[in-house]
């Protein structure tokens, strides 16, 4: 009995999903803000971040201290 009920429910769910998709595909919806401007907002935000970090990394004068090799000399060890 269980497989029969399960298959009936699956068919019912598939049909309802198919009907919903068919209903949605026939509707004409107007584009919202994200449809109109989403890609432009994303591209301008990415450009702003890249330009800002490029300026900070190259022009502000931050000492980044990437590697101490060749700049750090060990102090002489003193016996006490």
Curated annotation (Swiss-Prot):
One Pfam family it belongs to: COX7B
Chain ranges on the Mitochondrial matrix side, renumbered to this chain: 25-32
Annotated transmembrane regions: 33-59
Coiled-coil stretches noted in the UniProt entry, renumbered to this chain: none
Main location: mitochondrion
Pathway(s) of this molecule: Energy metabolism; oxidative phosphorylation
Mitochondrial intermembrane side: 60-80
Subcellular location: Mitochondrion inner membrane
Membrane topology: Single-pass membrane protein
Keyword set, alphabetical order: Membrane, Mitochondrion, Mitochondrion inner membrane, Transit peptide, Transmembrane, Transmembrane helix
Cellular component annotations (GO), alphabetically ordered: mitochondrial inner membrane; mitochondrial membrane; mitochondrion; respiratory chain complex IV
GO terms of molecular function: cytochrome-c oxidase activity
Transit peptide: 1-24
Any one GO biological process: central nervous system development
Keyword set includes Transit peptide: yes
Protein family (similarity comment): Belongs to the cytochrome c oxidase VIIb family.
Related illness: Linear skin defects with multiple congenital anomalies 2: A distinct form of aplasia cutis congenita presenting as multiple linear skin defects on the face and neck associated with poor growth, microcephaly, and facial dysmorphism. Additional features include intellectual disability, nail dystrophy, short stature and cardiac abnormalities.
Purpose: Component of the cytochrome c oxidase, the last enzyme in the mitochondrial electron transport chain which drives oxidative phosphorylation. The respiratory chain contains 3 multisubunit complexes succinate dehydrogenase (complex II, CII), ubiquinol-cytochrome c oxidoreductase (cytochrome b-c1 complex, complex III, CIII) and cytochrome c oxidase (complex IV, CIV), that cooperate to transfer electrons derived from NADH and succinate to molecular oxygen, creating an electrochemical gradient over the inner membrane that drives transmembrane transport and the ATP synthase.
Subunit structure: Component of the cytochrome c oxidase (complex IV, CIV), a multisubunit enzyme composed of 14 subunits. The complex is composed of a catalytic core of 3 subunits MT-CO1, MT-CO2 and MT-CO3, encoded in the mitochondrial DNA, and 11 supernumerary subunits COX4I1 (or COX4I2), COX5A, COX5B, COX6A1 (or COX6A2), COX6B1 (or COX6B2), COX6C, COX7A2 (or COX7A1), COX7B, COX7C, COX8A and NDUFA4, which are encoded in the nuclear genome.
Protein name: Cytochrome c oxidase subunit 7B, mitochondrial
The organism's taxonomic lineage, starting at the top: Eukaryota, Metazoa, Chordata, Craniata, Vertebrata
Gene that encodes it: COX7B
């Amino acid at each position: 009995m269980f497989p029969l009920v399960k298959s009936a429910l699956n068919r019912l769910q598939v049909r309802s999903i198919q009907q919903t998709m068919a209903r949605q595909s026939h509707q004409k919806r107007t584009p919202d803000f994200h449809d109109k401007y989403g890609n432009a907002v994303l591209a301008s935000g990415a450009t702003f971040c890249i330009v800002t970090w490029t300026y900070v990394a190259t022009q502000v004068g931050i000492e980044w201290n990437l590697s101490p090799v060749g700049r750090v000399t060990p102090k002489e060890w003193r016996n006490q």
